[in-house]
Amino acid sequence: MENADSLLYETVCEQVKLVNKYDLPATFLLQYDALINPLYQDLLKSKLNDHSEIGAWWELTQPQIEAAGIKWRGEHSWVSHANIAFSTGYTKEERERLVDVYMAKFKEIFGTYPKSIGSWFIDAHTLGYMYDKYKIVASCNCKDQVGTDGYTLWGGYWNQAYYPSRVNAYMPAQTEEGQIPVPIFRMLGSDPIYQYDDGLGQERQGVISLEPVYEKAGMDRRWVDYFLESIVDQPCLAFNYAQAGQENSFTWSNMSKGLEMQIPILDSLRKENKIRVETLGESGAWFKECFKVTPATAVTTLTDVRGEGNKTVWFNSRYYRANLLWERGTFRFRDIHLFDEGYKSAYLENPGDGNQFLFYTLPVVDGFMWSEGLDRAGLRIVRLDKDGDKEELTLDHPVVTEIGKDTLVVSAEDSKGHPFKITFYETRFEVAALSKEADLSWALELKVAAGKELPFTVIEDKAVNASFDGFNYVITCEKGHIRKPESGSDYAFRILPSDQEIVIDCTNTRLNCTHEK
């Protein structure tokens, strides 16, 4: 144990040296057991450059739990079980005591309260309490993942940052009144093409991210260049962002190669005025100054680090997220999830009692959960002939254009040269065929793997009603017509255009949709 403590401390020492060498601002988030350790206190007070930041890391250990007068339930002083290591495992009153204990100790040591607090996940009650009482300005949580370390966060705002709902910190809010005014930045830098499908068919996903310990991702210069090209140089709407770094539990010997490669790259991009390097607190303050509600953002990846020709575009707003994927000569909407601030977290009022936590949003298209092997779920464009037969269309050579700060246009052609345009707005998306071929007959068609349970309850001409985890929601067709599957059909529903255009509203506000949870 003594050697483990030494390795953890050595890692932070080396990280401090590295950011100081390049005079970069950095944020060090301290778990309570590190906060009360004089070694870390002295190091960060005396060695860290003065434009860096010290904040809180909200993974709960025995010293903090016992300082709050709560019985420790773990077999060791640190465990990864969600109902012990995270705030979701405690009552609301206990969550507040845990915050008060940490804040008091932090102020005793550093003379002020932390502005930034991060974790793999912080529940809405805790985060709201941190803001209401201590006025934190920024938070961060884990990238989307399924089952990794026992933690599932799926369907959320992909990359960048969002204001969370007061009743569900994973769910972006739609209104100022319904949000916690603390932006949550998504950590770790997911591979825009490959992270989503990793581990499909297995109990948990692997990791393909900017984290410097991963040989085929954040440790690989080619992958880092590929990732940063998407973040720095491609269309992104309001802004783009990535978090670089690694928790010290991975130790310096495992992260040094990747981190010592990444930091000079970031420093060079900063000197070229292509990026700003900021503390988490600075980014949070900037976000709050610029955005009263969650903005629309995008991540555009049109080159493939693996040389397979795959491409992807992510769009996020406070109402929904959507993902387009070009893969192995095919094209589809791989993902669409709606956001609704009224969808309460299961952990809002009561503690979780298992070693996992699960957070979801409202699925419309789920290319991971509804796929099996090579049978990939997605919303595809199909051409229909007079006999009722169909042909899946592949849109290729995409051109991605920003129209203002909240509208993204993706233009592409099918194999016969028919142009299509997909436009993402904050509240809706549109798919239009621009072909001069007046009788071009096409549709959007949702297909999923056999045997997958879907949330759709009633399919109407203008709406698909759905229910997920007891919460009702609706996908509304503003232009076009929705068709139920016919007997023997291989699709879940089909959307036909009107005047060669389909418009889908993603605000979940149709009057006859009663939300219950």
Language-model features and meaning:
Residues L324-T407, D414-K416:
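Acidic-aromatic substrate-binding/catalytic surfaces of carbohydrate-active enzymes
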Residues D406-P455:
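Acidic, contiguous internal or C-terminal segments within carbohydrate-active enzymes
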